[in-house]
């Protein structure tokens, strides 16, 4: 929608709209998150953002029943000045400083669920249910020194990774899930797997272990990204752990509308393949493949693989 200059000046003459524009330039945020940051009701936020959406200054994206808003920062001195002023206002009222905390709250439910005691269940047979995963690893095997399973959970992929790689590091932020994973490793007899408690987004300590040896040949992030407030941060962190020529393999859901999964800690209801590819490229990887996985899983899964170039700086 074309906006004449006078209309744009009038639109940006409202301090509340300047705040909204600045906050959505900082992070893609839901209406509910904006309401929390500005201490207003969601209907008020919806009313105030609507004019910005109508002229294209805010881009809206659906995720199930939620709407996320992001500022469309075109090369325009007036809009740039508006965002700068909005940031000043948000810094003054404290809302800008709260953005990181609000985004982190997206993951609170999944953290509570994963740390909860699990029902006692028998350890599955070694290799049970892994046949469908075998095609994923075929193009990734030239380098077989080290694989990292980021967000290993209870170790579902470890019986496949352990025989293929000399060393495997399995990382998870849930101590409870790692304890259950350790019991499974003992039962399976997988001696070359080492468990580490931590988050892939904060990979500094892991890098100290991995990078002196040249980096990992493979980092797997399987059904993890939909639990994270900022999935792109995990992809960037994983990329930094790869050796030149190493691969990042992501398995996650295609877009779906099963809102009930939010009760199980799902922050996002799947991802568009183009979104995964965009994040892979932004992290400094060359896309190898982004495609649906031929499994009966519901919601349907997809695979995205990126390769770290030989002279990558990421």
Residue ranges of predicted features:
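A conserved beta-strand element that flanks and buttresses the S-adenosyl-L-methionine
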Residues: 220
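N-terminal helix-turn-helix DNA-binding core of bacterial DNA-binding proteins
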Residues: 3-41, 67-71
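Amphipathic alpha-helical dimerization/coiled-coil segments
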Residues: 78-124
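Beta-hairpin "wing" of winged helix-turn-helix
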Residues: 54-63, 70
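Conserved alpha-helix/loop element of class I SAM-dependent methyltransferases that forms part
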Residues: 126-145
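A short glycine-rich, Lys/Arg-flanked "PGG" loop and its adjoining helix->strand segment in the class I
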Residues: 232-247
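C-terminal alpha-helical "lid/dimerization" subdomain adjacent to the S-adenosyl-L-methionine
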Residues: 247-305
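Class I SAM-dependent methyltransferase SAM/SAH-binding core
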Residues: 148, 154-207
């Amino acid at each position: 929608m074309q906006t004449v200059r006078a209309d744009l000046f009038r639109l940006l003459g409202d301090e509340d709209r300047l705040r909204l524009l600045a906050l959505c330039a900082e992070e893609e945020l839901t209406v509910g998150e904006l309401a929390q940051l500005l201490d207003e009701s969601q209907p008020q936020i919806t009313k105030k953002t609507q004019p910005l959406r109508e002229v294209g200054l805010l881009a809206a994206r659906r995720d199930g029943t939620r709407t996320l808003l992001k500022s469309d920062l075109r090369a325009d001195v007036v809009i740039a000045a508006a965002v700068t002023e909005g940031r000043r206002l948000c810094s003054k009222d404290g809302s800008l400083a709260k953005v990181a905390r609000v985004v982190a709250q997206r993951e609170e439910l999944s953290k509570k669920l994963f740390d909860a005691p699990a029902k006692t269940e028998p350890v599955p047979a070694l290799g049970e249910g892994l046949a469908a995963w075998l095609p994923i690893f075929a193009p990734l095997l030239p380098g077989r020194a080290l694989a990292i399973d980021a967000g290993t959970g209870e170790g579902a992929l470890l019986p496949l990774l352990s025989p293929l790689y000399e060393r495997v590091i399995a990382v998870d932020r849930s101590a409870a899930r790692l304890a259950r994973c350790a019991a499974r490793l003992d039962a399976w007899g997988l001696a070359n797997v080492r468990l580490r408690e931590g988050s892939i987004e904060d990979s500094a300590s892991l890098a100290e272990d991995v990078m002196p040896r040249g980096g990992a040949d493979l980092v797997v992030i399987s059904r993890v990204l939909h639990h994270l407030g900022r999935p792109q941060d995990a992809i960037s962190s994983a990329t930094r752990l790869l050796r030149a020529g190493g691969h990042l393999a992501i398995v996650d859901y295609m877009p779906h509308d099963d809102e009930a999964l939010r009760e199980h800690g799902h922050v996002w209801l799947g991802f568009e393949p183009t979104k995964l590819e965009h994040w892979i490229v932004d992290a400094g990887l060359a896309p190898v493949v982004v495609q649906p996985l031929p499994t009966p899983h519901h919601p349907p899964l997809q695979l995205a693989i990126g390769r770290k170039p030989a002279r990558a700086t990421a």
